[in-house]
Design a protein with these regions (language model features):
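Basic, Lys/Arg- and aromatic-enriched nucleic-acid-binding interface segment
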Residues: 152, 209-236
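N-terminal core-binding DNA-recognition domain of tyrosine recombinases/integrases
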Residues: 45-59, 69-197, 216-219
Length: 236
């Protein structure tokens, strides 16, 4: 079964505050032609994002909108399970999804989510929830969507936004738990491999220089003899 195409869910903060869903026919169809929880979840997200837009910076709103939108699209179109029924295992599945999303959910640039046309706003066909960044000036390599992999920092930012979303819903008594907070502790993408870190040490030449200086200081002032003793002890 082919992966459903993703459609944008939320316009800019200014447009979202007083949104008229009739002006977004594709979005309206998605919410009306599916189970009733689609609409309620979208309204939860809208309420949360308006709260973020009112109290945080424009950058924070844009980042949270991206993450909440991805999560809701996965909930709607992939998992097909209400947010208040999701468990830790579901969230870990979402992490796997974000690690390797469907190719049709990946684009190469940042596009406007909605475009005006015929008196309404239509979802931009070039837009996708995930973006594969291409190095500037790299025109020799053909972009390969299958190589998309988010950094650990990107996944951490995603989890942070969704944790905040669930926390808001709990405070508003829409949800009773925060499965994302629990899942993050067991997410394999956040478990760091045990690595032997290079210990920074002075080279032999550097040590010799320090020792020579200490000797000179001790020769000129007996008060520095203790320093010479300590440095010599560290060296040996």
């Amino acid at each position: 079964m082919p992966t459903p195409l993703a459609v944008p869910l939320f316009p800019t903060y200014t447009e979202l505050k007083g949104i008229d869903l009739d002006a977004y026919p594709q979005l309206t169809d998605l919410l009306k032609q599916n189970e009733s929880w689609f609409k309620s979840h979208w309204l939860w997200a809208k309420e949360f994002l308006v709260y973020i837009g009112r109290n945080k910076s424009e950058h924070t709103f844009s980042r949270f909108r991206t993450e909440v939108e991805r999560f809701l699209l996965w909930t709607f179109l992939i998992k097909e399970k209400p947010m208040d029924e999701l468990r830790k295992s579901d969230i870990l599945e979402y992490a796997d999804f974000c690690w390797q999303p469907p190719l049709t959910w990946i684009c190469f640039a940042s596009y406007e989510k909605f475009l005006p046309g015929g008196g309404v706003y239509i979802g931009n066909k070039k837009w996708a929830p995930f973006r594969l960044k291409i190095a500037k000036g790299d025109s020799t390599t053909k972009p390969d969507k299958s190589k998309y992999r988010p950094s650990q920092e990107t996944l951490a930012a995603s989890f942070t936004a969704i944790i905040s979303f669930y926390t808001y819903l709990m405070n508003e008594e829409y949800c009773t738990g925060n499965p994302v907070l629990i899942a993050k502790k067991d997410c394999r993408y956040f478990i760091k491999d045990a690595q032997v870190k290079d210990i920074k040490r002075l080279t032999s030449d550097q040590w010799q220089h320090v020792l020579d200086v200490a000797v000179e200081l001790a020769d000129s002032d007996p008060n520095h003899e203790r320093s010479l003793f300590l440095i010599a002890a560290l060296k040996t």
